[in-house]
Amino acid sequence: MLDVCLLGTAGMMPLPNRWLTALSLKYNGSNILIDCGEGTQIAMKEAGINFKPIDILCITHFHADHISGLPGLLLTMGNAERTEPLTIIGPKGLTRVVTALRTIAPELPFEIKCIELNEQDEYFEMNGYHIHAFRVKHAVLCYGYSVEIKRSGRFSVERAKEKEIPMRLWNPLQKGNTVEFEGRVYTPDMVLGPARKGIKVTYCTDSRPLEHIVEAAEGSDLFICEGMYAEKEKIVKAKQYKHMTFYEAAEMAKRAGVKELWLTHFSPSLVRADDYMPQVRDIFANAYLGKDGKSVELMFDED
């Protein structure tokens, strides 16, 4: 099970009912935070999300509405007596930016490990998360993120017995570990069937539509994508400032074959957003407006 909570849906500036951009993902006691705009701490408190288990922070880019909440969050994590290292992933220049922001949070009881993205696509495996960082098209260097929880094949007692694998090795093999025992090497594929479908969430904000985004989001259970503008005539502004309209996000969701779309990162000028959703659903039926605190528990498929 993967817990997803959209903490902030505002772009550019916070509003009374919209904190700036942030997304929380929780799996097996570990949290990923994607972006950390102003108000993220309050949004986490409102959603009942603990600060301490955040192990990984993914930053899309260095515009203030996506990173201005970081110094305060680091201080709060330090005050919670956290000692475990925090990994921060972000575009080239991340170390310099984090160092500058830490001017007001200089002494922390935990280590910060910065991973700078340099390639078009980069992949990481941490704490059971498979993270794909993919470059998008904004006014500055910017990345989207797909986070996947993979699922191994079903354990076969029959195969284990056929291969005379000692019962004491079944559990580590079932967990995907290779084991050496009494001079013989045992691998998970000896006892596991084909890999089963996992859970995938893709998050993209601050970009023009790209085939690269469609490819990264393909097959996602949930696609969280910016819809900066809802008014169709604002396509001109979207192109000028490298953002998307509701309808462009819906087109990408349709082409990527995702199960569900949440729109987010709204312009401060956007009001009565619900009025535009019928037109959006004409393009992609399973589209919804993101709201601060909107959450879902994504489950593995029954099989």
PLM feature spans:
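Active-site metal-binding motif and surrounding structural segment of the metallo-beta-lactamase
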Residues: 38-89, 113-118
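Metal-dependent catalytic neighborhoods of phosphoester/phosphodiester hydrolases
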Residues: 69-77, 98-101, 271-279
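Metal-dependent phosphodiesterase/nuclease catalytic metal-binding core
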Residues: 118-263, 272-283, 299-303
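Conserved beta-strand hairpin/beta-sheet module of binuclear metal-dependent hydrolase folds
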Residues: 1-47, 85, 145-147, 193-204, ...
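Active-site neighborhood of phospho(di)ester-bond hydrolases with catalytic His/Asp-centered motifs
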Residues: 34-37, 54-62, 90-91, 202-207, ...
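A gly/proline- and charged-residue-enriched helix-loop-helix capping module
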Residues: 96-103, 114-119
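General small-molecule cofactor/ligand-binding pocket signal
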Residues: 5, 89, 113-118, 132-134, ...
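Short, surface-exposed connector motifs at secondary-structure boundaries
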Residues: 26-28, 53-54, 80-85, 255-262
